Amino acid sequence: MAPPIEVSTKSYVEKHVSLPTLNERILSSMSHRSVAAHPWHDLEIGPEAPIIFNCVVEIGKGSKVKYELDKTTGLIKVDRILYSSVVYPHNYGFIPRTLCEDSDPIDVLVIMQEPVIPGCFLRAKAIGLMPMIDQGEKDDKIIAVCADDPEYRHYNDISELPPHRMAEIRRFFEDYKKNENKEVAVNDFLPATAAYDAVQHSMDLYADYVVENLRR
């Protein structure tokens, strides 16, 4: 078992996270289903969210294949092969039991030493937010580190990363759709507190979504 991670943001959780979360209470009533587990809806986000949370990996570091979650089946499908001569610089996926305005779970890029297979999940720690506009629509990304990687778990804010690492991430997202004639704009990276707020907001949107569906 990995040694405990010291996070200096305990006060943030106490102020912004009510336990038990609405997500957990509502979804527990939906657990008596004879269907396969769905990584978006059935995997818990984790008790330390929005700082440390579970992340489902869709795309492994170094991959040119754009995998994504099939929201109907819960399986990971091949969406396309990237048109540009680039590969994902880090593992990429989503945070379960979250929801954004585009009706998808919130995206997260996880910095760690090794690539991992699509469909697995890991514990990630938010260190920053990358505001992004994809074809005119908001598509922000949480930047995180693997909470169980001894090389990266001590990072608490994106400002602690080497400047080259941040430039690498920015350049990938600016370029990876250029050969599809799709415009992507990446704004300045925001600190860890902005990432916590974004994750918490997506958790709240998901909880509201579940409530509305239970009322139908």
From Swiss-Prot:
Keywords: Cytoplasm, Hydrolase, Magnesium, Metal-binding, Phosphoprotein
Entry's family note: Belongs to the PPase family.
SUPFAM superfamilies in alphabetical order: Inorganic pyrophosphatase
Role, per record: Catalyzes the irreversible hydrolysis of pyrophosphate (PPi) to phosphate. The MgPPi(2-) complex binds to the enzyme only after a free Mg(2+) ion has bound. No activity with glycerol-3-phosphate, glucose-6-phosphate, p-nitrophenylphosphate, ADP, NADP(+), NAD(+),NADH, NADPH or phosphoribosyl pyrophosphate as substrates.
Name this protein carries in UniProt: Soluble inorganic pyrophosphatase 4
Main location: cytoplasm
Cofactor entry: Mg(2+)
Binding locations of Mg(2+) 2: D107
Localization per Swiss-Prot or TrEMBL: Cytoplasm
